[in-house]
Amino acid sequence: MLSYADRLRSMRETKIRHTLEKRKQNGYTDLDDFGTVPISEGYHVEPWYNSENGSFYGFDGMSENFCRVIDAHEPYVDPMEMLCGRWRDMLVNYRGDLHYMPDWLKNSLKNKEFLAAGATHQWSKRWDEQRFPYDDLKPLQEKYNITTGIDGDAHFACDYRIGFELGFGGFLEKIEKYRKLHPDKSAFYDAEKRCVEAIIRFIDRHIQKIEEMIPNETRPELRENLSEMLLTCKAVRYDPPKTFRQVCQWTAFFNCASRIYTRDGAGFQLDGLLLPYYERDKAAGILDDETAKFLIANLLLIDPHYYQISGVDENDRDRTNALSYLILEAADSINIACNLTVRVHENCDKAFLGKAVYYLLKNKNGWPRFCNDKTLAEGYMRNGVDKKTARERIAVGCNWMCVPGREFPMNDTVKINIAKVLDEALKDLRNEKEPSTAALFTLYKKHLSKAVEVTAAGINLHLDHAEEVTPELIMNLMMLRSLETGTDSSRCAELYTIGVDGAGLAVVADSFGALEQRVEKEKILTWDEVFAALDSNFADERTRLILSSSDKYCSGGSLADEWAKKLTE
């Protein structure tokens, strides 16, 4: 009889094989290790473009093409697993975004024609520039190498508690309930309904596949597993999940759908939302810890959504529980790219924290990550929110936080390259009669103000029209007030704390520090020599080494450290 360890080993080997196959299919990629499986032979999607520029937008365009892509997905069932479902493809691949597009799609004749019509690495067709142009912003966006956030999708977090309470059938009932209250929002509700029905069809294909597989499975334990999987899928196709296995399977199906739609990878407080199901099933005698660990490992395998574990509540009570430990053990048992973040605080369970660090060092696989509650909570409270909300703002992204279901932060989609801002300031410094770091800093602030202004204009454009371009039809289902009002998450959020990354802080701090140290204090170099080095791309080795060997940011008490503080005040 196969043990859980045997099955996990097989699942991990399959994951590695799939990764190697995807590398051949996709070519070079600089992305997350998604939970995708390879594209099957004969897979094809015929996108529907509802814009003259050859792309699709809005409620009709996004819902229709989501249905086409998810309907093209074959069911994925592995008898070794307790949960089923995988995703293979995503809508962004059909909107001219070269960053995400895999080789298998780039090489198709129709897509080559699409790309030839104007999609580039910087300007894809994800934004409807025919209706909402921003040519007036592009010169400064290019000048300061700004990642604008215009056309940025997902990068917020929905509240999974809503889905766990309603189920997919509950979504449909809620859509019809509020459609009656907002008859003028029929396009919104039609689109939401189409998407939910497509997810249910996705589940139905898995049900059919499992039914076909059960008679042919020779191992009794795997045949029994498939029978349980079938009952689980039937239970969650319409109704809300009631057991630990059901809630994990429901999450797996939703995560596949949200990834297909906009690559959404924001999960939830994993040891919090799943805890009631775990405790209830344990008390009922229908779940043991080894099975719970296997199910969690299976969920992490299906897709590496970003989850937070541990943490602290608004009363400073540690949130670590038995499931927190099991999640770490589950991740260790599968040991793939698991996007788990441990929230560390003063009252953190020291044994749990030690175990988390142990797994990081043992597996050397980049998990778990750690975030500091004190800095994150106190920093967010400076925006005027209360302590409870700050503690609910959890780590559910690659480098960002969000209050699930309430916040629309655009995190990690907007960046100003402050090294490029410094470069422009250095160009202007040549015109100064007496160059100095003080004069350079004044010029830097002038250019930074311009960069911030044009960035804000781009953000406002996105917020004004995101619903008309890329409405978040899947995440809307679990966003507070979205279905209730018939409006997109971008317009109905309670909190708008737009995050703008200042990329290049270390480079700029080091540069200011090097100039002050080598030119002004030590007088080893002159400003003319610095300008000559910039013009020649530091061809003179002596000048390059003098500047590069200056005291660096984070070395402790350096000029660069002082500049870093000044740059961020």
Roles of regions detected by a PLM:
Residues 190-201:
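Extended non-globular scaffold/tether segments
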Residues 1-192, 221, 225-228, 232-239, ...:
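Conserved catalytic cores of very large enzyme subunits
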Residues 214-217, 221:
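A conserved hydrophobic secondary-structure block that centers on an alpha-helix together
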Residues 538:
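Active-site-surrounding "flap" and adjacent substrate/cofactor-binding loops of secreted or lumenal enzymes
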Residues 201, 205-208, 212:
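Extended, non-transmembrane alpha-helical coiled-coils
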